[in-house]
Design a protein with these regions (language model features):
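Eukaryotic tandem repeat interaction scaffolds
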Residues: 7, 11-33, 41
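Thr-Gly-centered strand-to-loop micro-motif
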Residues: 13-14, 37, 73-74
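Short loop/turn microsegments at loop-to-beta-strand junctions
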Residues: 31-34, 91-93
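Core beta-strand residues in small-molecule sensory/regulatory alpha/beta domains
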Residues: 37-38, 97-98
Length: 122
């Protein structure tokens, strides 16, 4: 299942956080995108440094900048189907959600390759 090769410990941020705080978090964690959650930690979408750069100067919080275009899968989903979805989507990763719609992790092409190598060569 997707659970075996997803990356955990993903940086999330509440949709009510300020733009400057989010940029600082991106810089601190060396990422260009944050996963956005609501007060109940349910996934809402993503915010990228590119989105902030384009319109971040006219908003106080990241809420209006959140995009809901990144494909999602759920824990327990079939690994092969997730791999096919990742490749066909053109996105650099898939967001993995738990049944309660909170973030479990992400699947990247690198995490897929590592899992495949582990299966092939142990």
């Amino acid at each position: 299942t997707v659970d075996h090769f997803m990356r955990t410990g993903i940086i999330t941020v509440n949709q009510n956080r300020g733009v400057n705080e989010c940029v600082s978090r991106m810089q601190h964690h060396n990422v260009d995108t944050l996963l956005v959650v609501d007060e109940n930690r349910r996934y809402q979408g993503t915010v990228s440094i590119a989105d902030i750069r384009l319109t971040g100067h006219v908003v106080k919080t990241i809420g209006p900048l959140v995009r809901c275009t990144t494909p999602v899968v759920h824990t327990g989903d079939n690994a092969k189907e997730c791999f096919e979805q990742l490749i066909s989507s053109g996105f650099p990763y898939l967001v993995v959600l738990k049944q309660d719609e909170t973030v479990a992790g992400i699947v990247t092409k690198t995490s897929m390759a590592s899992a495949m190598a582990e299966q092939l060569w142990g």
